[in-house]
A protein has these predicted regions:
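Catalytic-core segments of nucleotide cyclases and related cyclic-nucleotide turnover enzymes
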Residues: 61, 65-68, 98-132, 136-146
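Catalytic core regions of nucleotide second-messenger enzymes
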Residues: 46, 75-93
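Cell-envelope/extracellular polymer assembly enzymes that use nucleotide-activated donors
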Residues: 2, 94
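Conserved catalytic motifs of the protein kinase core domain
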Residues: 1, 51, 105
Length: 146
């Protein structure tokens, strides 16, 4: 089991500039994009604001990181409402990835994915950071930008 923590970059600026209806339209479009491009066994949930989690059963860390980067890249190439007003002229996401360890709870797993997500934000956004399988550390997996 792996999890992706996904956050829309600069979402507050999008809402402030274009209004909440545009922000809501972008959230719906992102949810639809993920739904169409993930497996039927995967679960997508919005956990607040502009943050989503994706549960990936039967998926190891490397596979989850590939899924995360595929989604990140698709978002970057997709036209979103208000995206033209975002930095770089496009909507982007940052993603934290973690896989369940035998000794941890679901809350621990989510906390590690969330920590990796915030590391992705700190590294400049529009990238994927994967939490390592060793306790407490995260390593950069992908940082691709156009």
């Amino acid at each position: 089991m792996s999890i992706l923590a996904i956050d829309i970059d600069y979402f507050k600026a999008l809402n402030d500039r274009h209004g909440h209806p545009t922000g809501d339209a972008s959230l719906r479009k992102l949810a639809g994009l993920m739904t169409r491009n993930l497996r039927r066994i995967d679960t997508i949930a919005r956990i607040g604001g502009e943050e989503f989690v994706v549960l990936l059963p039967r998926t190891n860390l490397s596979e989850a990181a590939q899924v995360a980067d595929k989604l990140r890249s698709m978002v970057e190439r997709t036209e979103f409402p208000g995206g033209d007003g975002q930095p770089g002229g496009m909507l982007t996401v940052s993603v934290g990835v973690a896989s369940l360890r035998p000794d941890e709870t679901g809350a621990d797993l989510l906390a590690r994915a969330d920590k990796a997500l915030y590391e992705a934000k700190d590294r400049g956004r529009n990238c994927v950071v994967s939490a390592s399988q060793s306790a407490g550390s995260a390593r950069s997996l992908t940082r691709s930008r156009i």
